[in-house]
């Protein structure tokens, strides 16, 4: 399933696998002046190819290497031989061989699918990408992944944030994210001159500074409360229940890979093997 929305010269694609007539676990990509920022998941690659058929596409820029952002790379590049794909240097091994370098849990295979390999070139922090009308700058923003980039157009005040910025108040985190790096990266972009924020997993923000300030304040406050309870001897499971509420559907679907527990562990800079209360809904604390 694919829907499009125009924001001036920026065309937004919302993409999701269709299950029982509905799109599930959406991701977002953008087209602007010959550049595609991310390409969605493998399950929607055919629809994306069709949507791009009449458009002049010069290059793809991936904000990071997760499967729901690179899934259209291979098919689109195959359709347009020689099409340049750019990504952070740490992302290139994944793009070249996704099956080997980024094994997927069952839920990720089901909702987004295995990406095809593609050929890509490196783009590092501070690199400039010029199009006919715009000049973009890559900004390294790790945390959601080690290879995460944002794309900034200073004259327009546009910032394409990939999955660095997500909407709402986070109650769960994936096991391989780093929450403190996410906060640091959010702070690094907050000082930019911004008019519009184009996220990979949220609605477009027309008041980006306020959105970023609110997100940072929430995450820092939550982190402070996690650390305080841990200092007082609370177990991870009890902290998760106290601060993040009851069980979430996503915890069941992902078998705990994306959970309240993982968010608490990330704040504590601990791994699952470091604690002895593996069940987030058992008592403790």
Where are these regions (language model features)?
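Active-site neighborhood of phospho(di)ester-bond hydrolases with catalytic His/Asp-centered motifs
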Residues: 37-40, 58-66, 85-89, 140-143, ...
């Amino acid at each position: 399933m694919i829907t499009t929305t125009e924001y001036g010269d920026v065309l937004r694609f919302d993409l999701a696998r269709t299950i029982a007539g509905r799109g599930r676990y959406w991701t977002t990509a953008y087209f602007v002046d010959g550049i595609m920022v991310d390409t969605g998941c493998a399950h929607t690659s055919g629809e994306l190819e069709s949507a791009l058929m009449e458009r002049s596409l010069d290059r793809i820029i991936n904000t990071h290497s997760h499967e729901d952002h690179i899934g259209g790379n291979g098919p689109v590049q195959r359709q347009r031989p020689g099409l340049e794909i750019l990504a952070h240097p740490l992302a290139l091994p994944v793009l070249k061989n996704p099956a080997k370098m980024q094994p997927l849990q069952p839920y990720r295979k089901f909702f987004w699918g295995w990406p095809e390999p593609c050929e890509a070139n490196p783009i590092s922090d501070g690199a400039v990408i010029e199009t006919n009308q715009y000049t973009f700058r890559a900004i390294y923003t790790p945390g959601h992944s080690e290879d995460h980039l944002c794309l900034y157009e200073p004259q327009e005040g546009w910032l394409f944030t990939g999955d660095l910025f997500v909407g709402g108040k986070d109650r769960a985190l994936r096991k391989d994210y780093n929450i403190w790096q996410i906060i640091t990266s959010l702070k690094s972009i907050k000082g930019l001159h911004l008019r519009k924020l184009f996220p990979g997993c949220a609605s477009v923000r027309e008041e980006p500074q306020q959105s970023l300030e609110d997100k940072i304040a929430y995450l820092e406050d939550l982190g402070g409360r996690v650390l305080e309870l841990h200092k007082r001897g609370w177990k991870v499971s009890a902290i998760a229940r106290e601060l993040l509420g009851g069980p979430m559907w996503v915890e069941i679907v992902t078998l705990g890979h994306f959970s309240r527990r993982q968010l608490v562990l990330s704040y504590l800079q601990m791994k699952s093997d470091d604690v002895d209360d593996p069940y987030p809904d058992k008592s403790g604390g």
